[in-house]
């Protein structure tokens, strides 16, 4: 069994030794990827990041793998992306076809996730051109698009959407990106998502819609935006009648929007009218009359179907 000293000594020879000596070691059967330094870096890893590109090209020519993570779980490609080292990324792609684009960090982040953290657009474009999975998810089920929106990187988000990213992708809790931005109260991001096809009535694993979240969290501007975008008010296990009435009253939400949403809601007709009348929800009288007429007409039309 080889000692750690000998292993590290072989790493040093592979990473820093004369190339003729390296070639002799490889001919003798030394595994080019097995020998690492104390940080878990292979000779290829080390030479790329110390700038010895001729040696890196030599090692790649002799089948050194770019896919071996260091002690922090980061591959060469992942760290190049994090550092926005575009020239070295291109060098790697030009000198080997053996690059796994989907090896993830300990947090489950792919290189594409990493590229979005700092909105490294050129790195994103290069990865997507090489076939990176645009909807790949991390350990929490979040796609790269989740991260761009949550961190308000809308330029990166637009690039992902233009390449086919799923705007309604769900995480491990079945929350969509629209659900997740409620806590940030990011109106600009919400508008961006809705303009790009986000489903305003989609439910998570607790049957909450984005509107439910906005109402419960008392985010008036978001709630009104969702209502304007076709969100429907609903009552169920997650939002009973009293809670809904009190929350709407507390927010002083636009009555016209509530009125219009109730017309398309699957709440029963009696409850719709009661919602405008009870619990001190003071809708204008013409709204109540309009709703009553609408409900009456709905009953008449239903009778003739």
UniProtKB/Swiss-Prot annotation:
Keywords: ANK repeat, Repeat
Intervals holding ANK repeats: 5-34, 39-68, 72-101, 107-136, 140-169, 173-202, 206-235
Xref: Pfam families: Ank (PF00023), Ank_2 (PF12796)
Keyword Flavoprotein belongs to the record: no
Keyword Repeat appears in the UniProt entry: yes
PANTHER family the record matches: CYCLIN-DEPENDENT KINASE INHIBITOR 2C-RELATED, POLY [ADP-RIBOSE] POLYMERASE TANKYRASE
Protein name (Swiss-Prot/TrEMBL): Putative ankyrin repeat protein RF_0580
Organism name: Rickettsia felis (strain ATCC VR-1525 / URRWXCal2) (Rickettsia azadi)
Lineage, opening ranks: Bacteria, Pseudomonadati, Pseudomonadota, Alphaproteobacteria, Rickettsiales
């Amino acid at each position: 069994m080889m000692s750690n000293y000998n292993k590290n000594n072989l790493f040093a020879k592979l990473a820093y030794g004369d190339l003729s000596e390296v070639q002799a070691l490889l001919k003798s059967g030394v595994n080019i990827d097995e020998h690492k330094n104390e940080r878990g870096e292979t000779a290829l890893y080390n030479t790329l990041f110390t700038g010895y590109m001729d040696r890196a090209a030599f090692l790649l020519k002799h089948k050194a793998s770019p896919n071996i993570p260091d002690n922090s779980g980061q591959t060469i490609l992942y760290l190049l992306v994090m550092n926005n080292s575009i020239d070295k990324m291109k060098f790697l792609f030009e000198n080997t076809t053996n690059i796994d684009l989907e090896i993830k960090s300990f947090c489950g982040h792919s290189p594409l996730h990493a590229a979005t953290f700092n909105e490294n657009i050129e790195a994103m474009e290069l990865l997507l051109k090489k076939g990176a999975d645009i909807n790949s998810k991390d350990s929490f089920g979040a796609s790269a698009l989740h991260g761009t929106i949550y961190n308000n990187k809308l330029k990166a988000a637009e690039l992902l959407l233009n390449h086919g990213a799923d705007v309604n992708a769900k995480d491990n809790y079945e929350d969509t990106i629209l659900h997740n931005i409620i806590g940030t109260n990011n109106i600009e991001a919400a508008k961006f998502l809705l303009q790009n096809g986000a489903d305003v009535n989609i439910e998570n694993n607790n049957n909450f819609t984005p509107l439910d979240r906005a109402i419960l969290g008392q985010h008036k501007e978001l709630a009104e935006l969702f209502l304007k975008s076709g969100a429907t008010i609903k009552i169920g296990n997650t939002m009973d009648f009293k809670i809904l009435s009190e929350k709407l009253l507390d927010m002083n939400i636009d009555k016209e929007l509530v009125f219009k949403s109730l017309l398309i809601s699957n709440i029963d007709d009696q409850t719709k009218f009661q919602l405008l009348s009870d619990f001190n929800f003071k809708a204008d009288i013409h709204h109540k009359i309009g709703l009553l007429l609408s409900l009456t007409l709905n009953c008449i039309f239903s009778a003739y179907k």
